[in-house]
Amino acid sequence: MLPVTFIHLSDTHFGPTPEYARQGHRSHPYARHVVEMINRLPVRPDFVMHTGDVTTHPTPAAYALAAEVFAALDVPIYYATGNHDTSADIHRYLTMGPKEDCQPDKGTLSYTFTVRGHRFLVLDARGPDAIDPRGLLSPQQLDVLRAEATPDGPPLTIFTHYPAVRLNSPWMDANMLIYNGEEMHQALLPARGRLRGVFFGHIHNSTQIFRDGILYCAVASTFAGFTTWPNEEMIKADHDAMPAFNFVQLLPEQTIVQQRPFARLAEATAPRRADGSSRNLED
């Protein structure tokens, strides 16, 4: 089996204009900078995977900016639906590489694709707005997962926006997980011998969890971070966190995840308020 390499990025949070800012940073310049860095890498990845929150508010203007920025990539890009996205909008506005949809309706974004014999599955855990920011896998999505997560088959990698298992951070565990994440984890167990990893975003923090032989791996946001400490009852904007993406190698005998943090962009810093604070977590 030949190696496969990909870029994992997440939580770009495009706004309606390039001037849009969140947590004290303008997201558009960072996304553009990430694309430039990916195109300059000394190793050409096979694809880019964006695990959701392409936008902050799913407007045509925000998706148009995202489409324009990511069209400059030299390799195909794929998307998962974040809690700030809608699956229908991603279908409508964003171009992806070759894939096979797992469900025919445009209200769900779930699909598979294959690269050099490696199997990739994207799950849609975007639930109803009433449970936001938590996720939920529908019965249909659990059926898709169980059909893919069998003991035998090619190397398998899973992508979704939300974490499925506990992060040992009180607020995150109460508010950010997939409601039926334990059911998802149990569904994955038959495939753990060929499962290369479950990659997600949502938490704006580089985090790895290893449970029952399964690697769960989150990537930092491309522009703004959250704290996830085990003694926090409420998360905060992490102004010490660096923006980043991950360079992932799927080798015959191992999975390598290399975090690629990069320096803050002076031109992307948003003005602070008179009291010295930056925008809140949802601005």
Q: Would you name each region that the model predicts?
A:
Residues M1-L65, T108, T150:
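N-terminal active-site segment of His-dependent metallophosphoesterases
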Residues L2, P243-D283:
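A short C-terminal boundary segment appended to hydrolase-like catalytic domains
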Residues P3-P16, G117-G127, T157-F159, I214-S221, ...:
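Active-site-proximal beta-strand elements of phosphoester/diester hydrolases
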Residues D11, G52-D53, G82-N83, H161, ...:
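Active-site glycine-centered loops adjacent to acidic/histidine catalytic or metal-binding residues
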Residues Y20-R26, L136, P170-M176, E232-M234:
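Short glycine-enriched, charge-decorated loop/helix-capping segments at active-site entrances
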Residues V34-F47, P133-L215, F247, G276, ...:
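His/acidic metal-ligating clusters that form di-metal
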Residues T59-T150, N180-R194, I209, A220, ...:
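Extended active-site neighborhood of metal-dependent phosphoesterases/phosphodiesterases
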